[in-house]
Amino acid sequence: MFDFFKKTAQNISNFLGGGAKQQIEKELLEEVLIEADVDYEVIEQLLQHLPQNITRNQLEVGLDRFFRGESYYDKVSLKDIPTKPLVELIIGVNGAGKTTTIAKLAKRYKDSGKKVLLGAGDTFRAAAIDQLKLWSEKISVDIISTQYGSDPSALAYDTINAGSARKMDHIIIDTAGRLHNQTNLKNELLKITRVCSKALNNEPYRKILILDGTQGSSSINQAKIFHEMLKVDGVILTKLDGTSKGGAILSIIHALKLPIIAIGVGERAEDLLDFDQKDFINKLLDSIFEVK
């Protein structure tokens, strides 16, 4: 899964030098984790009960304890929504990869035999509407769109009604990532969430935040703003094939207490992978202790 980790691993290899390591001094390991863009508060939490010279097994224990301490799979999980259609509102700043991620989700659902409808809800960017239309044609799923500058809440309402009438399994709705100021964006997004609830007769739906993985830990502040505003249900990290900041996943989990649903590792519609905690831990350990 975590082949994207090769850039993070290469960065660590350049830092440590080649050759497998039996153990690493705690101070050096701190520097390695900082190099991988792990937040210092998280590093302290990971290493606080470990000895001065740390083996792979000992760091694995620390990472396991971190995930348990964050209640990552005990309390923090993506809520199951049995109602149909399942509506997912896609949120995030422009440039984070929202439109491409929508296409990847849609293809995943379609390939599993589900009926999918897209909603081009970023009506303040003509390019966003056009891009989502192109993706809908490429992966052969239906789309509801409107003219540039139209009311995005009305588009969301129409998309949900159309999806219900057409017996769709999944509805995925794009949203704006930037308006003239943050207050306008907040008001617009809150309005869309109210309209979605109304169209669904107050049945639950998902709000998924898209974060640019190349931004690493610096994306956390914007994520907190969206989460405080909308109570996000989960996160998808994009562009992780092109970054050496793979360790930021730990920082994001710690800061947001939200499940990471999937990771984007390329531009193709197939390049969306489920996040797997154990695979992530193993690849991080490999990049530190099995340096090529």
UniProtKB/Swiss-Prot annotation:
Catalytic reaction(s) noted: GTP + H2O = GDP + phosphate + H(+)
CDD domains listed in its UniProt record: FtsY
Subunit comment: Part of the signal recognition particle protein translocation system, which is composed of SRP and FtsY. SRP is a ribonucleoprotein composed of Ffh and a 4.5S RNA molecule.
Domain of life the protein comes from: Bacteria
PANTHER family: SIGNAL RECOGNITION PARTICLE RECEPTOR SUBUNIT ALPHA
Enzyme class of the recorded protein, top EC level: hydrolase
BP-aspect Gene Ontology terms: SRP-dependent cotranslational protein targeting to membrane
Main location group: membrane
Function: Involved in targeting and insertion of nascent membrane proteins into the cytoplasmic membrane. Acts as a receptor for the complex formed by the signal recognition particle (SRP) and the ribosome-nascent chain (RNC). Interaction with SRP-RNC leads to the transfer of the RNC complex to the Sec translocase for insertion into the membrane, the hydrolysis of GTP by both Ffh and FtsY, and the dissociation of the SRP-FtsY complex into the individual components.
UniProt: GTP binding residues: 92-99, 174-178, 238-241
Keyword line: Cell inner membrane, Cell membrane, Cytoplasm, GTP-binding, Hydrolase, Membrane, Nucleotide-binding, Receptor
Listed SUPFAM superfamilies: Domain of the SRP/SRP receptor G-proteins, P-loop containing nucleoside triphosphate hydrolases
Species assigned in the record: Helicobacter mustelae (strain ATCC 43772 / CCUG 25715 / CIP 103759 / LMG 18044 / NCTC 12198 / R85-136P)
Entry GO MF terms: ATP hydrolysis activity; GTP binding; GTPase activity; signal recognition particle binding
Designated name of the protein: Signal recognition particle receptor FtsY
EC number in record: 3.6.5.4
One Gene Ontology cellular component annotation held by this UniProt entry: cytoplasm
